[in-house]
C-alpha cells in the first residue's frame, strides 16, 4: 500500500469505538475526546468534511448512574444510553466550540436508513450540516433500537452513513492495529493485512471474533462494514486509534492499519444501485431545456422543466426520467410524491410552497440522488 485513501478523500466518516473515548469503560475520557476533536478540526481546515460516528453513550451512562458493571437487561442498557448520550453530546459540543466549530447530534436506527422517505430526510439533514461546516456526531438511537443494542455494531452504522452521504472513505478506529491473518492474541505469527479488496470472502475467515469488554463489536463486524461501504464505492481503513495523530497522518497519505478498497468507483456503484436494484415506480417527462441541464451541466432536476408525470410514487422512491420522445435519460430518488409532482410540474421552485403549502426541497430530484444514463 503506497498511500492512504484518506489523502484524496473529500468526505470522510470516522467511527470511534468505545475503548477510544472512555476511561477503561468508566465514563468519558475527555482528553481523548479533545484529541479527536482537534484532529477533525484540522481536517476541516484542509477542506475535508467529516462525520463522526461515536460510541461511548452507554459507558458514560453506566458511570453517571454509578453502576459497577455493564448490565445485561435491554431496558437498563437503554436507560444508560439515554443518560449517557447527554454527557457525550455536551462534551463534544464544548470541545468543538474551542475550535470554532459546532457539533450536531444525530440519532439513527438501521430502520431510519431502510425507509426511503426517512433515508432522504436524513441525507438532506446531514448534507445541510456539512455545508454549514457543522460536525455531525452520530450514534444509534439505543433508547428505542432494541436489536441494535444487542448487536452493538456502530461499525455497521458507520457503513450505512457512508452509503447515505456518499462518503469517499470510512475510517474505523479500534484498539487493534488493523486486520490480521489470524487473531494476534492467539496466533503468534499472525501478520497485518495491509491492503485487500473489501468483500473478499477470505477476509471474513481471517476476522475471528475478538472484541473488547467495553464495546460489543469484533473484527468481523468491521469487515462486514467495509463490504457494505464498498457498495457505494467507498474505501475503508481499519486502524488503531492509539496511534498518535492517526487521522492527520492518514490524511497526509501515510499507510496505517488495513486498507480495504472498493472495486467500483463511487459513481459506478451509485449508477448500478439506482439502475439495477430498485424498482421503478413512475416517470417524469422533461422538456428539452431540462434534458440539457441534466446531460450537459450535471444539474439537479427542478419542477420547472417537468412536462408530465406518469405512474404513482411516494417521496423517496425511484422514478425514470425521460425526454419528450419517451427515451430514458436518467433515474433518481424523487423528493415529492406523484400527486405533489403533478401540482408543481412546470412551475419554478419559488412557487412550490404556494402550491403545496410547504417546500421540502427546491428540487424534484437532487443531483446527488440522480444518475444520468444517456
Curated annotation (Swiss-Prot):
InterPro entries: AceGlu_kinase-like_sf, Asp/Glu/Uridylate_kinase, G5K_ProB, Glu/AcGlu_kinase, Glu_5kinase, Glu_5kinase/COase_Synthase, Glutamate_5-kinase_CS, PUA. It is an enzyme of class 2 (transferase). Signal peptide: none annotated. CDD domains: AAK_G5K_ProB, PUA_G5K. Pathway: Amino-acid biosynthesis; L-proline biosynthesis; L-glutamate 5-semialdehyde from L-glutamate: step 1/2. Its EC number is 2.7.2.11. This is Glutamate 5-kinase. It comes from Thiobacillus denitrificans (strain ATCC 25259 / T1). The gene is proB.
